């Protein structure tokens, strides 16, 4: 009997839709012409004034403190965020599954424990946390957006989920990722297209785009994503959030589902998306204080450190990757940051030239598919799943082909050689951190996110990078320069299609890059920078 992939998707989506309680459904959905839907949760009448305040006003650190001070209960928080997540799903398609009753039961347990003992179970006690779907949660699906895996139920929590749960977090929903988990957008045959809550003609990013959209519409305060080419940073940027791509080997990936477990030429990472620098610190400290290296032999036994930034922070300014220049909104955000920081003697700004970023893309795009994509094609073919355009695009980069072991060794040596060259390149400038765009545009139009190099280069180099919001697109300020002379065909294509009206209300963010395994120093530097912006 031939399995029809449409039936698999329909069954999965029926379960998703059935997880939304009837009282949480919007009576009249906005028309498709309504692009910015970020205010609808607070205006649709489903949330109480207190629920609006709890979901909109605070970051995760503040909510954890409010629980500690007995100003709010976990049940109240979980109820508010579950209701808002249900609303968000109806507006932007950013939830794979809402497990309201399960979350409510856990929240009640935590409230009762605190009432009886006067002690918190951990630093995230009672705080609702959302999770990208391929990061396993016990008794829930772990499809990684492959239709062939749609019936797989995780038998246990991934290591990271177990750690965050032990820290007191309450998991309440899973969020979608794209087909193959390899788009800077979020579209799949399993759950459809996730759109940006600030402008539904734009992408929320990917591959942690469900998390990005959910946090962007304030239906989550802290989310867990993953990143192998920009998959935390792209959604964070597109939705005006903070998002950290940690250095590898600090947080466990055990229990994260995908197609190529065991591939080590380019390691993916897991990390947080949230509303503040201190939330990034809260998450990382909570996870690493648990000593995850005692359960995952791949991790570095490196405790989380409390550090302060240097009195004078030397910031490298990389305005462009010299392959595709940023469009006017991104260039303006860079200039805004430069102007503010240059006024303060505590910042020493130095222009830094990129080092062969075109080569970095040729290298990493080849390393993503060492078997030429065979494992992925086999999974698609197993149920006749159609290959989506962005999957086709990334799997057909010019250097993608099957490799024998000798070719893998050669490629890995080339990676290490590039890392060493870049190490010396940055040492010559003597910078503490690099300030760069996250991409050449604000959130791309749906189906058009085809330039990864502003983020993927740091995956190749394994440097920690964190995204932070700066401004929003302003059609009056971000006018197109009709006299612009492009550097090459890619740059021409990026600039010729630019129109500020297309990006109405889109957040504009920047990226700060640190030194390998100095994630603490990176966040300390960002905290100092954000205080000036």
Curated annotation (Swiss-Prot):
According to the UniProt record, which cysteines are disulfide-bonded?
Answer: none
Which residues participate directly in catalysis? 132 (charge relay system), 207 (charge relay system), 231 (acyl-ester intermediate)
Specify one Pfam family.
Answer: Amidase
Q: What class of enzyme is it?
A: hydrolase
Record GO terms (molecular function): amidase activity; fatty acid amide hydrolase activity
Catalytic activities: a monocarboxylic acid amide + H2O = a monocarboxylate + NH4(+)
Q: Which residues form the signal peptide?
A: none
EC number(s) recorded for this UniProt protein:
3.5.1.4
GO BP term (any one): fatty acid catabolic process
Gene Ontology cellular component list: cytoplasm; cytosol; nucleus
Does the entry feature the keyword S-adenosyl-L-methionine, yes or no? no
UniProt keyword terms in alphabetical order: Cytoplasm, Hydrolase, Nucleus
> Where does it live in the cell?
Cytoplasm; Nucleus
Report the superkingdom from the record: Eukaryota
Family label = Belongs to the amidase family.
Q: Which PANTHER family match?
A: AMIDASE C550.07-RELATED, AMIDASE-RELATED-RELATED
**What is the name attached to this protein's record?**
Putative amidase C550.07
